[in-house]
Curated annotation (Swiss-Prot):
Tissue: Ubiquitously expressed during embryonic development. Some enrichment is observed in the proventriculus area of the foregut and in the hindgut.
Source species of the chain: Drosophila melanogaster (Fruit fly)
Domain of life per record: Eukaryota
Lineage of origin: Eukaryota, Metazoa, Ecdysozoa, Arthropoda, Hexapoda
GO cellular component terms given for this protein: cytoplasm; mitochondrion; nucleolus; nucleus
Enzyme Commission identifier(s): 2.1.1.203
UniProt-recorded name of the protein: tRNA (cytosine(34)-C(5))-methyltransferase
A GO molecular-function annotation: tRNA binding
């Protein structure tokens, strides 16, 4: 009890409370206190705005927003195997879904409603399940569905995303040649959609000429954005961290070598909002909602869309969206920017891009009120002076004649009850001419960037070698150094001409001349290259011209990884993440076509120290192996429906796949192989663990009883001490080949 032999009263009380209180497993079974889905101010305010045409519709609206949100997901459309995965979903997965839901709700299978294919999503690639996220996560009959959603999301086969959140990228209408800016991109589900659209024509472009620049003001959320977007392994993505309302002008290099201010073809402004359209997904908003949120956000929303309009190319398209129902955050912001643009911006109707979507037109009349909705204002003159800093003139609707010219009815208002979804607002703007308030001075911007790149001047010293203090200050206002928040990022070091590592890579993999070594980069300056990344030419140009102008979080896709092995002279292996890119430029010498049975066997081999022997492969594959030297290679499998490419390793007498666990399961699913080896049932695992813990507790009690009744001469248990088996080590041996840098050569 310590040196002073005094017992700590507070520690003892805490220990007693922990021992006598409910166990963690007991608490997990207890639900959170149910949130009361009601807010008098919310109901009064939206009744005032007449967002529903009739009392009957208002009743439907209230019933809908008080209900939980169904789960939705979409299939990644640009991948070659998308149709095959969709077929598996519609047959195997949904058959299992019907069986599990019938068991969960104790219904007959024929009474279970099948998942709904969203009619407005392109190519029928999105589905809505009549289950909530909590249903899927906490119900044992649905564990296979839960496993599928987790694995396929990680592998990039699908994306879990709220249905209405899919609308803005669709109406933005991105093409492979577009320069796209996502101004408020985190957490990244819409960014992933934009990347998919950019890669929609792989047969036309090895690497899309366009790019997606995804930005967010929150440094931590930027890493969430990277995690979401990296699943698609695009070399055409750049992630930045900046306040989008003051996003800097970026410099780009024109074909003639001159510099220019970058203008974007497509811009997505999914601005911060009060989020009251997400009440079904986030019921805690019922407790926090108040009208002051919309008033506070209106200004920042306007500044973001105004900055977006400045950076938009003439003829370009900007989509403004929120997950709010409030006209103060929606129509009021749009009428203000359109009025300030003085004819340079025009609202366009994009309803034809989402055929089958049910929505209402934008509002042309609305009212403002106090926080408690006890005073209603129709004109700014009615607002008390004490509220003038909160309620501004631009928030009120324009006179009817001016409003008619703006065309706010072209906006899309999606209400929850229309198609069992969340609430959302979308508007599409096109730029007809340059804005009067645009600033396009490229000369000063280039000078600032070049100055930042110059090395620091040598310090001046006196006769004794001591540094001389600088006392003179340049004349005029001084430019403050921008403070960067968050983590300090590693540098982006691009390959120079005749880089020795690139020459070795090019020779070993027979890389095409069209793959520019200038676009390969590492994240270290002095150390030996470990990971080599690839980015597209436009992304490289953006990084080099603007690395001192904006904080860059991430770019490039991992393409080559150092993996030295005594049986091969080449020190770099291919990375599965970059295979989508490198495959388009590689020669035939490091490729091998394999049969289905071979690929299934290799993917099922999860022990990196025991790779499949070439003698176990089919004869056709064995013959092809004879022409392939030791080292990294591409395994190609051709199916009637799709072609699969995976990274492999040819050992001296073995051939193995080099794929992470989730992608392994994804490929095996496409091949129709048995997945039981990888299947996990967390409920069964919990029961086994609980039973083991109970047995251990019984054993301890028996041992204690024996000790108390014995004469004190009992020997130690043969299972104690260093001879005990560590079951966690045994469990960890089921890891995947990517968990280690060991390369088997047997």
């Amino acid at each position: 009890m310590g040196r002073n032999q005094k017992q700590n009263f507070f520690a003892a009380r805490k220990r007693q409370k922990r021992e006598n209180g409910p166990k963690r497993t007991d608490r997990q079974a207890q639900p959170y206190e149910e949130i009361k889905r009601d807010n008098a101010f919310f109901i009064k305010y939206y009744q005032l705005q007449k967002i529903c045409a009739t009392d009957e519709e208002w009743t439907q609206f209230l019933a809908s927003i008080r209900d939980n949100l169904p789960t939705t997901f979409r299939v990644t459309g640009f991948k070659d195997e998308a149709k095959a995965l969709l077929s598996i979903i519609e047959t195997q997965l949904f058959t299992e879904y019907v069986r599990a839901v019938a068991e969960l709700h104790q219904k007959a299978p024929e009474d279970v409603e099948r998942p709904l294919c969203l009619p407005w999503y392109p190519n029928g690639l999105a589905y809505q399940l009549h289950l909530t996220r909590k249903d899927i996560r906490r119900s044992e009959p649905l564990y296979r569905l839960h496993n599928f959603l987790i694995v396929e999301t990680t592998a990039g086969g699908i994306s879990r995303q709220e249905a209405v959140s899919m609308i803005p990228p669709i109406v933005l209408d991105v093409r492979p040649t577009d320069k796209v800016l996502d101004m408020c991109a985190a957490p990244g589900s819409k960014t992933a959609q934009l990347i998919e659209a950019l890669h929609a024509a792989p047969e036309e472009h090895k690497i899309p000429p366009g790019f997606v620049l995804a930005n967010d003001v929150d440094n931590n959320r930027c890493y969430m954005l990277v995690h979401q977007a990296k699943r698609l392994n695009s070399p055409c993505l750049l992630v930045t961290n900046h306040d989008s309302s003051v996003f800097p002008n970026l410099v780009t290099t024109k074909p003639d070598g001159s510099k220019a201010i970058l203008k974007f073809d497509k811009i997505l402004c999914d601005v911060p909002c009060s989020g009251d359209g997400t009440l079904r997904k986030n019921p805690d908003i019922w407790l926090k909602w108040n009208l002051a949120q919309a008033y506070n956000l209106h200004g920042i929303q306007y500044r973001i869309v105004r900055r977006g309009a400045e950076m938009l190319e003439v003829g370009g398209r900007l989509v403004y969206s929120t997950c709010s129902l409030n006209p103060i955050e929606n129509e009021a912001v749009l009428q203000r920017i359109i009025k300030d643009a003085d004819g340079a911006l025009e609202l366009v109707d994009a309803g034809h891009l989402v055929p089958g979507l049910k929505y209402k037109p934008g509002m042309t009349d609305w009212k403002l009120a106090t926080k408690e909705v006890d005073q209603i204002f129709t004109r700014f003159e009615e607002v008390p002076e004490s509220l003038h800093t909160i309620i501004r003139p631009g928030m009120f609707p324009l006179p009817a004649d001016e409003m008619a010219k703006i065309g706010l009815e072209k906006c899309l208002r999606v209400l929850p009850h229309l198609q069992d979804s969340g609430g959302f607002f979308v508007a599409v703007l096109e730029k007809r001419r340059q804005l009067s308030f645009e600033k396009n001075d490229v000369v000063e911007l280039v000078k600032l960037n070049e100055t930042a790149k110059q090395p620091a001047a040598e310090p001046q010293v006196d006769a004794d070698g001591k540094p001389i203090e600088e006392k003179s200050v340049p004349w005029g206002p001084q430019r403050k150094k921008r403070r960067l928040h968050g983590y300090k990022e590693d540098p982006y070091v691009f390959f120079g001409e005749n880089d020795p590592d690139y020459q070795a890579i090019k020779e070993f993999y027979q890389l095409d001349e069209s793959l520019s070594q200038r676009c390969l980069l590492t994240r270290c300056v002095t150390e030996k290259k470990k990971n080599i990344y690839y980015c597209s030419e436009p992304i490289r140009d953006l990084v080099l011209n603007n690395e001192n102008n904006i904080k860059i979080i991430n770019t490039g896709v991992k393409t080559f990884v150092r993996c030295e092995n005594r049986h091969t002279v080449h020190p770099f292996r291919l990375a599965q993440e970059g295979l989508q890119t490198s495959n388009a430029f590689m020669g035939a010498s490091r490729r091998i076509q394999v049969e289905r049975e071979d690929l299934v066997m290799m993917l099922n081999c999860t022990d990196p120290t025991q790779p499949p022997s070439t003698h176990e492969l089919k004869k056709e594959t064995q013959e092809r192996c004879k022409e392939l030297g030791v080292g990294s290679c591409i395994l190609k499998y051709v199916d009637q429906r799709f072609t699969l490419y995976t990274v492999g390793w040819r050992g001296t007498s073995s051939l193995r796949a080099y794929v992470q666990k989730d992608e392994t399961i994804h490929i095996l699913r496409l091949l129709g192989a048995d997945l039981s080896k990888f299947e996990t049932n967390k409920y069964e695992d919990a029961r086994v663990a609980a039973a083991a813990a109970a047995d251990a507790e019984v054993g301890k009690s028996a041992e204690a009883e024996a000790d108390s009744s014995g004469d004190g001469d009992a020997t130690e248990s043969t299972f104690s001490g260093s001879g005990a088996i560590d079951v966690t080590v045994a469990a960890e041996t089921t890891g995947t080949p990517m968990d280690t840098e060991v390369v088997a050569t047997s």
